[in-house]
């Protein structure tokens, strides 16, 4: 199950506030999630760890979610998925991967999303989608000998550098801008050095 930086923020906050030994997002990611490479440029995401032969979510205890109040966006929206559009809206997709899960009364997509896809989550998803292309582009321009440095900035500003006692979205926006500035400068320096080599 994917866990984005908004999910990591709220899951960490929930665990901290309910008596867990988890106090920061880095601890949460280390204990409960695994990074997965999304693109060869180095862009990675996190997925929640699983346990057992059936790859059960690490937070599922006795067939109940132990973090129900802070569960990941993908869990809240299931069996639907969200695909942001360039026009600023969303397409809602229906997962048919596990048909046996879908028994019971019919659900209207509009009502499901209104209940489970908050205004903050909508704003976050749109802004993350809008910036992801530029982040990937800059990462591709950065040479291998500086890629580790770039990815440390990526990890810090996408996932780690948050104060759990302040609103998430404002911090996310600030971190995104910082990350784009840093990666742009690293990519620009590489482009400039190549130009200088030709003179």
Model-derived features: positions:
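Short loop/turn segments that flank or connect secondary-structure elements
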Residues: 1-199
């Amino acid at each position: 199950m994917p866990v984005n930086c908004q999910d990591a923020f709220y899951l960490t906050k929930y665990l901290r506030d309910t008596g867990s030994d988890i106090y920061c997002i880095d601890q949460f990611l280390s204990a409960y999630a695994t990074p997965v490479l999304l693109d060869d440029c180095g862009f990675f995401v996190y997925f929640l760890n699983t346990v057992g032969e059936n790859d059960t979510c690490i937070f599922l205890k006795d067939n109940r979610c132990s973090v129900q109040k802070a569960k990941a966006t993908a869990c809240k929206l299931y069996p639907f998925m969200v695909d942001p559009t360039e026009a600023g809206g969303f397409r809602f997709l229906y997962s048919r991967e596990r048909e046996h899960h879908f028994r019971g009364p019919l659900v209207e997509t509009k009502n499901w999303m209104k209940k489970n896809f908050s205004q903050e989550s909508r704003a976050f998803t749109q802004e993350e989608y809008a910036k992801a292309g530029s982040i990937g582009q800059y990462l591709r321009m950065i040479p291998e000998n500086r890629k580790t440095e770039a990815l440390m900035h990526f990890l810090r500003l996408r996932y780690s550098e948050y104060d759990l006692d302040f609103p998430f979205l404002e911090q996310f926006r600030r971190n995104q801008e910082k990350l784009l500035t840093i990666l742009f400068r690293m990519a620009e320096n590489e482009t400039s050095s190549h130009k200088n080599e030709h003179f």
